[in-house]
Amino acid sequence: MLGTGITERLEENPLRKELIHHPFFKEVRSSAELDREKVGIFLGQWWHPLHYFPNFLSRTIDQLDMLEMKTAIGKILYQELGEGDPARAHERIYVTTMQEAGFDEATVAQAAPLEETRRLVQRYREASADRLSALGFVYGTEVADLAMVAGIGNAVRRVSGLKDLPWVDIHILQEPDHVAQVNEAIEPDFSAEEIDIIVANAEEMWSLWTNFFNRLRKVMFGTEELPAAAAA
């Protein structure tokens, strides 16, 4: 299990708190400006890290030496890919859920990435080339994921009127297990220096997501126009 010291460092980290309490989430809960077009922008940008995440996990497994760590991350990957049923894969449920909410597939899964989105996915890819950075990025994602998913749920419910969103529901069901698996994936005998590297990479992950939401907030609720390529 993850040692108490590193758990506290990660859970209480100000960069994590900055992300999960990002003002963007308040905007999607209460802004009178929120409309279907704005939510479509949000969905189209979220697709890119969602789509790449299984690749990231599989590359992370390749970097791990301990079987226990491979198994822990492998369970997350198994759930992400539908537990043997492609129809239950997270990205498939994402598209079908949003289609049921009235968004077409082009809006949800074919929008060009904004620069912050592109950089986010790029760093997932680069981090997965090293064991410690990969673990930091996994943890950085999993301990903040529910707050971000809740933001999507709030936005989609407000503009669609739907209450049941299967993609949100599966995250609520599986995310506690994902966090537990990440905890199991941290070796109990990591050195202090290795722990510092894991934490530093989790911090970078949170900063990348914060930049992602900073840009979305400008595009959706500020004065910045969506680039033509991302609007296509």
Indicate residue ranges for each PLM-predicted region.
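Non-heme di-metal
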Residues: 1-232
